[in-house]
Amino acid sequence: MAQKIIRVGDIEIANDKPMVLFGGMNVLESRDMAMQVCEEYVKVTEKLGIPYVFKASFDKANRSSVTSYRGPGLEEGMRIFQDIKQAFGVPIITDVHEPDQAAVVAEVCDIIQLPAFLSRQTDLVVAMAKTNAVINIKKAQFLAPQEMKHILNKCVEAGNDQLILCERGSSFGYNNLVVDMLGFGIMKQFEYPVFFDVTHSLQMPGGRSDSAGGRRAQVTDLAKAGMSQSLAGLFLEAHPDPDNAKCDGPCALRLDKLEPFLAQLKALDELVKSFPTVETA
């Protein structure tokens, strides 16, 4: 099965290429913290030889509470992203929530992300596709892996085949998510790169009444399980002080654990991709 290669600058993204990291923080809390987080990611990924794209959100539009922190907003967010690109020379990925944001974000960011909750919103999908930017499509918690084909088709029909799929867990009763490991293989059959968002797969949606809970202690176990499926890359959020993060702290890796965490996953990725394919169909 031929695997499609997506190129972002000098980075090649494909299921049979070395793992790529989409990593950063959940939401832009401040310019200084974004710089601190990106600097650590750049240092670690350069040391380990992992291709890297910085991730953060300028707006968290689906918070559980109307009083929860959402981010600096579109204009300030784009200024911070431009500062990060200038300082570190890394590509940027961020999410888009409304059709009229797509073109503005695509002017600054190298990859634009379709949020899981919004992945069936045709107007948003088409607006994002028409930017011709690379799109990271999050699989909704309520969709089966095979249903991602419909979202891919919407993008292609709008003229964009620069697409990535991303698993982020499936609803498992109330306030819980589970990752179906068989789903990775189903999505890989579409031949587009598949990523694993381990951070949000650890969520317990609404688990703290007015915000999501999480299972940070299990991040290494779940990341290893996902990356054993020979994927294009990992989606990860880290924070210098997760217990005081403004969003999704219970799911975030401690920033000072980034190097040992990624070292294990890189070794696993190399091992898995060294194996010959065994046809069992």
UniProtKB/Swiss-Prot annotation:
Record-listed E.C. numbers: 2.5.1.55
UniProt entry keywords in alphabetical sequence: Cytoplasm, Lipopolysaccharide biosynthesis, Transferase
Pathway membership, UniProt: Carbohydrate biosynthesis; 3-deoxy-D-manno-octulosonate biosynthesis; 3-deoxy-D-manno-octulosonate from D-ribulose 5-phosphate: step 2/3; Bacterial outer membrane biogenesis; lipopolysaccharide biosynthesis
Reaction catalyzed: D-arabinose 5-phosphate + phosphoenolpyruvate + H2O = 3-deoxy-alpha-D-manno-2-octulosonate-8-phosphate + phosphate
UniProt-annotated location(s): Cytoplasm
Enzyme class: transferase
Keyword Phosphoprotein carried by entry: no
GO biological process: keto-3-deoxy-D-manno-octulosonic acid biosynthetic process
Recorded GO CC terms: cytoplasm
Any one GO molecular-function label of the UniProt entry: 3-deoxy-8-phosphooctulonate synthase activity
Keyword Transmembrane annotated: no
Pfam families tied to this protein: DAHP_synth_1 (PF00793)
NCBIfam families: KDO8P_synth (TIGR01362), PRK05198.1 (NF003543), PRK12457.1 (NF009109)
Family according to the record: Belongs to the KdsA family.
Name of the protein in question: 2-dehydro-3-deoxyphosphooctonate aldolase
